[in-house]
């Protein structure tokens, strides 16, 4: 069971853009090997930063509108949103330290 909540095209605005705290969005798909590799890292980040950051996942197969809106061409893509704006992007399966360092810049 993932620690990160699933977000859809319908709930993206409310859950991500209108969030009062920074949001880490994991764009993924079930068939994507690297996505499965980075999933435990995303869950660890969600637990480690639970009081500072909201972590959500968007299945790009089921929610193509949001993926298209943000120009997702490769997955996994992890985006950080703050005050309704995208402030950073990490593409690919990256180590936890890389993701944590990127996140720390925006807290």
UniProtKB/Swiss-Prot annotation:
Q: Which Pfam families match?
A: Thioredoxin
- Similarity comment: family membership: Belongs to the thioredoxin family.
Residue stretches making up the Thioredoxin domain: 2-107
SUPFAM superfamilies referenced in this protein's UniProt entry, alphabetically: Thioredoxin-like (SSF52833)
Checking InterPro entries in the record gives: Thioredoxin, Thioredoxin-like_sf, Thioredoxin_CS, Thioredoxin_domain
Cysteine pairs forming cystine bridges in this chain are: 32-35
UniProt protein name:
Thioredoxin 1
Q: Name one GO cellular component term.
A: cytoplasm
Keyword Electron transport among UniProt keywords: yes
Show the Gene3D superfamilies listed in the entry: Glutaredoxin
Give the keywords, sorted. Disulfide bond, Electron transport, Redox-active center, Transport
> Which GO molecular function, any one, fits this protein according to its record?
protein-disulfide reductase activity
Q: Does the keyword Transport apply?
A: yes
Show the PANTHER family listed in the entry. Answer: GEO12009P1
What's this chain's function?
Participates in various redox reactions through the reversible oxidation of its active center dithiol to a disulfide and catalyzes dithiol-disulfide exchange reactions.
Q: Which domain of life is it from?
A: Bacteria
- Give the species: Synechococcus elongatus (strain ATCC 33912 / PCC 7942 / FACHB-805)
